[in-house]
């Protein structure tokens, strides 16, 4: 359709040439991406594998009348203006409102309303605040389409990797053994857990997911260590565990650790509940209603219902019922699939194009968290700073961001790669470059130097190279304190004070 990469059909094979196909409708295959490669029995062509088994009713209700919100993720540097213009053209500007009274950069929400609601145009828009409407959200959402548009860092990283390597991320297979292995161990990266533990002193790291969006946090790494996912559908499960409430801790984790069930059976998304019940012979309406109750943390029963008796009559196991009762919020499956697809593509680059991976990661995620005075001084300096942060009783958000950045840098050094010093002649404003087999940091890595100031330096340098510190200060529009920091970092070595 061109709308999304996520195929909601059950897991299946299809021949791209003669269109022979085979569907697995019994729930035995978690994702079409996990199917083994096969050639078409009719014409011999390699079969295409897809399908994630997302019932339409999860989005639109059993009768298809529910109006739900949709999310559009786009690359950060795509530009909000371009996205807005496209939405105006697609939906019609006279039928679109921005809802809420606060605008968050990189995230916008819109309502598409039908022709009969043109009265809103006169009374309830607030110009020039981007056509913002201030109705009570719950009073109108059932009659309008909600569209959320978000700039996405993970997609931006994939885009950056494509630019750096020329490799189309859509050509990367989702069953690559080495890429999948980083979610279980760091072997494919050539690093042992003991080497990582020697540097990262605030917790063990046995998996290779440092820096992978959605799978690199301490919590996510802990889930991966417990689960040891072996295929794509299990990565989707892990993503659901991360986003749900009452889904992993004291629930799915215990079921897996106690060998009650395998990971493929435990609940991690809304679709897991509905599909499991349907495959056990429970009526579609009951399966849907139970799923709706469970996802909202309301248990199994509705008012005047007797769903529990229906589940018991269908021989739904007690562990499943107990698991449903513990859940307070259950996420949808599609965002978990998107998260797993994006992370696995990035993991492929981490294994096969490591320098490009680290360049893209630091370009997208470093921001003000790249402590150049620590990171550029090598592994010993990084280890010392991580130990200092680990010893703090109360970690601030800045401490956590700095630690995450240093951990990825340390991993890079352990894999035999290094940073160059920031170069007055070659560094970019905000992007890390690959130079002579090493990473060249941008100007915004200099402490207290923001993106705008970094851009001014590059703009002035492109006119002609700086001839002195005074020239840099004047044309580059930097303060004396920044000049002092650059001197301390060795960036201005050989540059005279005056012309």
Could you say what each language-model-derived stretch is?
Residues 1-499:
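Noncatalytic, beta-rich nucleic-acid-contacting surfaces in large DNA/RNA-processing enzymes
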């Amino acid at each position: 359709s061109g709308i999304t990469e996520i195929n909601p059909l059950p897991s299946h094979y299809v021949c791209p040439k003669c269109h022979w196909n085979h569907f697995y409708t019994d729930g035995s295959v978690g994702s079409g991406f996990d199917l083994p490669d096969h050639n078409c029995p009719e014409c011999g062509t390699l079969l295409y594998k897809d399908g994630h088994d997302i019932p339409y009713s999860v989005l639109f209700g059993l009768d298809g009348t529910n109006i739900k919100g949709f999310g559009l993720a786009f690359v950060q540097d795509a530009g909000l203006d371009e996205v807005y213009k496209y939405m105006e053209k697609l939906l019609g500007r006279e039928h679109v409102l921005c809802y809420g009274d606060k605008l968050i950069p990189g995230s916008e929400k819109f309502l598409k309303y039908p022709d009969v609601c043109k009265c809103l145009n006169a009374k309830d828009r607030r110009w020039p605040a981007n056509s913002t409407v201030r109705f009570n959200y719950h009073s109108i959402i059932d009659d309008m389409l909600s569209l959320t548009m978000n700039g996405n860092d993970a997609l931006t990283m994939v885009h950056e990797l494509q630019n750096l390597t020329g490799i189309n991320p859509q050509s990367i297979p989702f069953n690559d053994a080495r890429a999948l292995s980083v979610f279980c161990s760091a072997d494919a990266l050539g690093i042992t857990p003991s080497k990582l533990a020697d540097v990262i002193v605030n917790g063990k790291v046995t998996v290779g997911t440092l820096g992978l969006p959605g799978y690199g946090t301490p919590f996510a790494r802990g889930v991966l260590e417990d689960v040891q996912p072996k295929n794509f559908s299990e990565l989707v499960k892990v993503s659901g565990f991360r986003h749900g409430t009452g889904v992993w801790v004291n629930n799915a984790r215990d079921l897996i650790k106690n060998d009650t069930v395998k990971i493929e059976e435990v609940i991690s998304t809304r679709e897991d509940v509905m599909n499991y019940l349907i495959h056990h012979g429970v009526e579609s309406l009951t399966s849907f209603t139970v799923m709706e109750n469970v996802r909202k943390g309301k248990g199994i029963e509705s008012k005047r219902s007797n769903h529990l008796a229906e589940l018991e009559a269908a021989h739904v196991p007690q562990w499943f019922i107990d698991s449903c009762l513990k859940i307070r919020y259950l996420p949808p499956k599609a965002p978990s699939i998107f998260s797993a697809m994006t992370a696995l593509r990035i993991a492929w680059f981490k294994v096969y194009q490591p320098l490009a991976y680290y360049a893209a990661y630091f370009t997208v995620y470093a921001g003000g968290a790249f402590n150049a005075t620590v990171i550029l001084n090598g592994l010993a300096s990084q280890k010392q700073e991580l130990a200092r942060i680990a010893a703090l009783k109360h970690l601030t958000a800045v401490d956590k961001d700095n630690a995450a950045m240093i951990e990825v840098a340390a991993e890079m050094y352990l894999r035999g790669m290094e940073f160059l010093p920031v170069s007055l002649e070659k560094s970019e404003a905000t992007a890390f470059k690959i130079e002579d087999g090493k990473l060249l940091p941008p100007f915004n890595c200099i402490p207290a130097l923001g993106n705008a100031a970094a851009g001014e330096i590059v703009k002035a340098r492109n006119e002609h190279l700086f001839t002195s510190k005074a020239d840099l200060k004047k044309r580059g529009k930097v303060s004396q304190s920044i000049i002092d920091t650059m001197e301390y970092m060795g960036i201005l070595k050989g540059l005279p004070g005056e012309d």
